[in-house]
């Protein structure tokens, strides 16, 4: 009864809120009714959480008094009775308030507002999810602008660094246009370095420079043979001390010198910030470009003495192009039935007025609706937005920008109304993220799970269900897909600035989340979720008052500055005993306070703070913890009690992993990254026997002494999909252990114990049927080992780096690597590389890194018709061999659209 009360009240709120949204926005009676009902629901939630908190505290006190069970038991029973009595009294008071609210509804004649039929039609699993990844950024109507932009970026007549501006009203398609050109083969081939920076609200020049510097380093690191592989442990960004102030400006200038670069800046920029950016980018007359996507204010800021092309201004879509974008979003390769086509397409054009964002959001609603009844109801809902087409209104639907903004707002409101309730919460949560900036999908889903937004579904993990939620939001065009992995998972998403502003307004009105862009936070004591997204010079958080009702805090501060400031101790959270989510990035933090152990409701603890070096012993008291995500430069210790928390799902932290005897029942654990084994020496059975549901495992500091325990562990991990092993001695049996049949991604960093190939290697194609991605560093394998890799049936991405191969002659066998699409070789000792006939028939990208001794390219490259990109990193002799004219290897790669050379 007690646990069902908050759920029933939240259902009551959903009904009340739906009625409010169906009425006029100025209906104060309904607004008061919804607000009071929500307050009652919050009170019920507080009462239940307080009961659980006090009961948990009493339980810990009882366990800390050994040897006095008989004397302690009567008092404990009396205490529990008192707790339950207190909770029952609070629930009775809440029920009385609810009755008063219901009476007021009758008094003021707040009647039920019928819900339209279309609001119940949500076929997420069938229509929307099936097409979530078929939503490419269509550039219908932008062909002329694309050609203009390419011409300006690739213009050999202007060798000086030049600015290419794109401007226009919000949601007109500026970013879509720029990204299409940015990703084109011609641009990728022309520029050695390409960076893209989206400017969040109140961003500073140092943030822009730091982001450009980081992207440039990442591009060079992906090509170079470094001591750290490109896919470093989660939280690697937090481990890096990025320069600040003048240091980052000087380092960026130095690193960019000698390179032709394209720097894209997406957002409004001030004069001061533009001057800082311009001074940090060298102008060497090599045709470098700065592509600026901005508004009129941003254009005024960039006026300078250097070359600047005439701005490109995308127009609204014409009626014909509006039809085409809408058709593709709703019907894919099909089309609207002929008898409805003219009618609905005219409606869509009048409602959206040719604005691409409005078109795709409306399409996201209608793609799951039945035609014609539900379509008619949706169109009727937007009927007030219709106005006669005005002549001279531009390429699109005419009307002023304010009218278009109002129409776009109405469409977003309707799309939000159409979301199922659980997706409403997931969408509003995006108000706590930065706008127009990539958001890690795995982190977002883990936060949703911790908040309780994700509903369990038989046969699927909570994370898989959460990924489904995210895909549905993408399909509905409420969220933008930035990147997806090779295994079908969403990797990064973003939210358009207008959609983000809408989400923040809705979240604020519903008391869902309180967002601040300053570290000096003035928030009401009743706030339940707090987001601090600051780009100021401060790396602390100052609260004006205690927040006893706080459930979640998301803090994203700028990194890499003010290293001399006083460290935080999270004292501002001591009064927030109901916290469920702590997600903090950039805070100056060395250790967690002992008081963290009393916050027993915490489910997600994420601290991306590079100086973090100590965890308190009380962290083992967090009996509801699901995710521990730590990014730091220091290895940390945790008590054995931590490893016995049964709710653990994701541990990404530099921790020591004890022997299996000290591990509890970790049946929920799916992710274990960054840990190093301790107590695994000399066998001792299977150390991960109680974590058999692991999907992703990353271990470091492995030695030969760990071999027995590691192999025993791998034999029990039937569900493992990703494996990353690093150390002095790695077992080659990872290719032959039958239990790892689901393994898709494998990274090995260190010498393998059987360089010729493990026993049973002849069956590798059957034992590793799903292995898609393989990266090997310093493994020192022999030719026979490579021959084994060649028969893997689904290997699509292969990297052999930094002494991964032991020898100066490497051969890819005939008809081997049938599914390989991406190859990366960084073998400094390699002199001769031969490729057999019909080998790598689908190869699309080849990267050669510092293979300075390689005498020539394989002749077989000339016949690889799918090859789209060749990258040569620090290989000047090979660059000469592929030059047109006298290059002896030019004929082997002359058919490749993109050939990129990078020097270090």
Predicted features and spans:
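Regulatory and partner-binding modules of innate immune sensors/adaptors
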Residues: 68-170, 176-182, 207-210, 290-291, ...
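A conserved switch/coupling segment of P-loop NTPase cores
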Residues: 183-190, 242-317, 396
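A short hydrophobic beta-strand->loop->alpha-helix junction that borders the nucleotide-binding pocket
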Residues: 194-203
